[in-house]
Amino acid sequence: KATVLSPDGEMISERERRETPYPCTPDVLLEELRLLAATQPAYDRVSVGFPGAIRQGRVRDVTAFVRPAPGEPRDPKLVEQWFGFDLQSALADAFGKPVRVANDADVQGCAVIKGEGMELVITLGTGVGCAVFYDGALLPHMELSHGRFGEGLSIEVACGDNERHKVGKQEWRKRVHSALKAFEDMVLPDHLYIGGGNAKRLEESELGPNRTIVPNVSGLLGGIALWERTGDANASPIAHDHDTESAPAPAGG
């Protein structure tokens, strides 16, 4: 998805969406993002939400893209292409603009947290994303959803979209509630935010206290806050032009 935002977070273009093609190599992803950007009006800087772990702009892990298709085993050739790939520099070269890239849950979290104590953001989509903030600062990204869930499954797989289709709505909801409890036991957050495309499939009345469902559009709106909340641990800016006060756009991932 992509849009252009004003400095105060107002969308000044329609959201454009493209399905992720598989197999998705770095070159394929860059081309898809270029095509998304071409649908948008002029912009001054770029924020990208990526479905994997990013350290210093480089890919540390990306469960989704190292598989030929969702649900298939990892492909060693795709793992080799993605591990250590300097995505941030590649994006800066592609767009010729200042760029920040971070995990997509980190980006969404930047838009929804209050900056009070320990805050945990969980995104439910193709897989499961996680972001942790303390007093408004984004902590180094951790793939908490890689933890085990029952026999032979990770939390990311058990609560992901493929399994939702296999097991049905009620079983999927039970799994998600179990996973949320496990995350809370590990992180001890003061508040838990739940976003992503499948968050709407939960009943907010069943969530209990200190849990909030947030709109999926916050994944785009977080593109602005990403520049304010991130440090060197997860994302660092690469500038090819002078940075301006204009909105970071497009945001995609």
Q: Language-model features: where?
A:
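Short glycine-aspartate micro-motif
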Residues: 45-47, 119-123, 193
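Glycine-rich phosphate-binding loop and adjoining helix at the ATP-binding site
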Residues: 19-34, 38, 44-45, 53-112, ...
